[in-house]
Amino acid sequence: MKSNFKWIVLMVITPFFSNGQLPYLFRDTSIAVFHGSNRLQNPWASGMNTTNFAEIDLNGDNKMDLLEFDAPSFRVNPFINLGQANVSSYVYAPEYRSKFPTDMEGWVRTFDYDFDGDMDLFSYNGGGISMYRNDFSTGTGLLFTLITSSIQTHYGGFQTNIYVSRVNAPALSDLDNDGDMDILAFSISGSWVEHHESFAMDSTGNPSSMKFHYIPVCWGYFVLAGNRNSAILPPVLPTCPLVAANPYRAYFDQERGIVDEEVGQLNNSNKSMRHAGSSLVVYDNDGDGDKDVLNGDILGSNLLFLENCGTPDSAWICAQDTTFPSYDTPAYMLDVAAPHYFDVNNDGNKDLIVGNFFPAGEDYNNVIFYKNTTNNQSNIFNRQTDRWLVDGMIEVGTGAHPVFFDVDQDGKLDLLIGNDFYFDTSNAIAKVAYYRNTSLGSKAEYTLITNDYSTLSSYLLTGIYLTFGDVDGDGDSDMIIGHSDGSLIYFQNLAGAGNPCIFVLSQVNYQSIDVGDNAVPQLFDVNRDGKLDLLIGERTGVLNYYENMGSTVSPIFSFVSNNFGGVNVAKVGSVAGFSTPILFEKQGNYELLVGSFSGYIYHFSNIDGNLSGTFTLLDSMFQNIFEPRLATPAMADIDGDTAFDLVVGSLSGGVVLYTQDQTLSINSEQDESIFFNLYPNPVQMSLNLSFEKESTTRKLIEIVDVTGRLVYKLQSNRQQITLDVSKWTPGTYLCRVSDSKRTFTQKFIKY
C-alpha cells in the first residue's frame, strides 16, 4: 500500500471537524510509554534542561510536592509526591501550572516566611526579589498573592531593594534561629555574600512583617576566587565591606585594596573577582546549629561546600570541599551546578539534588540524586542516579521535534522525535528517537526502539526536523530532513511499498534549497495538482513555499515565496520565530497550524485559491496551548478514537500530549459553563470539581472506573463540589459531566 505522509494527514484530520467547529483538546498524561519493559512514570512531562527545584504542597495533603522551574522557557512543571515511604515517586500534575504566577524569571525559591505552614514563593524581578504569599485553602486550593515585587532592606540610613541578579540565586533561611527568614545573596560584584538579616520578630513579633537590614560584612568572611569555584578563606582575604566588628579587619581596605603582603598579589583592584552566575543553598550539614553552604558557580563545573565553624549569629567559613561530595562521586555540571536540599524519597532525611542552573549545560544526564544515607544532623550523600525524574520522561536532550509516521508499515502511526542536539562535555550532535506504536486494540501505547533512528548521528547534524512523502514515485515514503543551517537532506527509501522503511542518504543540500537557518519542512500538495510541494518553516518565523514544477517521479522544487500567506509567528521586536508548519484539510478546505518559539500555536484559514495572498489568522493561541519555548506540534489520531490529537515538542527536550474529547466541540457561541477542573490529580483523599462559570442549569456528574462501572452519580448546579474518595480503589477514573446538549470528560488517578 502506498504510504505517503500527506495522505496520512488528510486521512487523520478530515473527519474531525464536523459542523465547522473546532475540537476541544485537553492535556493528557495517561497514554503509556515504555523503555524496554519499564513504563515511564511521566512520559508527557515536557522534559527538563535547566532545572530549578523547590518544595511546595500543591494539593493540601501535608506532603511536600515538587515544583520545577525552567527559567529560559518561563515554564513551571508541578509534580505530586505520592508519599510512599523510602520511595522517590512523583507524578506530573500539569493542572497546577495555571496556579503559579506567570511573571516569574531567573530562579525560584520557596520558604515559609510567615511560618503558617505553607511554603511561599520567591523569584527574580528586575534586580530584586518578588514574593508571593501562599494563601492555600480548601475552597481555593493553591493560591498565590503578590506581597511585594521588590523586597526592601535597610542599608544604614536609607532603604532600597535587596539586589539579586537574574543569574545569582539567593539562599533563604532562618540563619540565626530567631523565627524569621533571613536572606543571603551575592553582592553586585558576585564575589562575596551579603547578609540581609530579618528583624521582624525583634521589632513586631510577627515574621511576616518583612523587615530586613543589611549586615555590612562578608557573611562567613569568605569570598569566591576570581577564576574558579572555590573560596578564599580567612586570614587570606581580598577586598570586602568593612565594619569595626569584623575580626579580619586587618586584611580589608576598601580604598586601597589588599594591604597585607601575603595576599597583595591576589587582588589589588578587585576586578578579577567579578562574575555572575551562582546558585546558593545553605543548610546545617553537621548538626552544630549554624548553616553551611553549597554553591554552584559559573567559575567552575564543580559543587563547592563551605563549612561554617562559627555560630548562628556569627558565621565563619573555615574549610571547603571543592569537589563535593569528595567522599563519594563528586557532582559535576558542565555549566553551573544547581544544588537543592530536600527529602526526595520520603524517609525523613533530606537528600541532595544537583541540576543545571544555566541552559548551556548537559541536557540528558542532568539531574543528579544523592541519597542521604544518615540523617539531617550528619548528612552523608550517596550518588544514586544522574537522571533523577527525567528518566521517567520522553527526553531527547535539547529541542524535541516530533512527527508521526508508520516506520514499520504495520498500519499504525509511530512517533519519531528529532532534536536540536544532545550536549555533553564536548559534543552537540542531533539524533532521532523512534517510539514504535505498540498499541493493542484501542489501548494506545508507545515503546522506545532506539534513540538514534537510522544512525543519523553519524552525519553530525544539528537541528533535525523530519518530513515524509513519496518523492520518487516508487510507492513508499522517502524522508527529507530539515537542518539547522537552513538546508535539506534527502534520504531515499529502498524498502518498497508496504515494507519497513530502509532509508539511504541520497543528496545533501537537497536541490540547493536554503532558507537561512533552522529549516522545518513539510511535504504536502499545496496547490492541489497531485504533486508533493515543500512548505518550509525557519528561524525568522515566516514560511517558504517551493512548488513542485517537476513530476511525482522526478520533482523539481522551485522557489515561489519566502512570505507564504503573510505568516510570521515571531513576536513583535523578535527575530526568533521558529515556524513549524502543519498544513491539513478540513471539510475540503486547507487550514494551517504553525508552531512558534513563543510556545503558542497559530491557526490560519483562507488558503485555497489564495496561495499568493494573505491567509486569515483565526487564532494566535490555538486551543490555549502554551508550551514554551519552541512549540513544535505534530498531529495524528494516536488513541484510535477517530479524532485528531497533538503532540507538542519544546526546547527542553520533551513532549506533551493533547487529546480530543469527541463529545465536546468549541466555538465562539458556546456556553462554557460545563467546563470544569479536577484537582488534585492524582488524588488520595478529597477530589475537588470546580466549574469555570456559574450556571443555574443542573448538570449530571458521573464517575466511572476503567471497566465502565458507575461509582458516583450526582445532579447539581453548584460551582464547587468536593468528593471524599479516600476509600475508593486506587486506579484510573473518568469524570463525566453532561447537560442537555453536551458531555465533557476528564481522567483522574486515585492512589
Q: What is each of the regions a protein language model found here?
A:
Residues 3-10:
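Sec-dependent signal peptide recognition
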Residues 11-19:
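Hydrophobic h-region of N-terminal signal peptides that target proteins for export
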Residues 12, 669-751:
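C-terminal outer-membrane/trafficking sorting elements
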Residues 16, 298, 582, 681-683:
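Hydrophobic residues in alpha-helical membrane-spanning segments
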Residues 21-666:
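Beta-propeller-forming repeat regions
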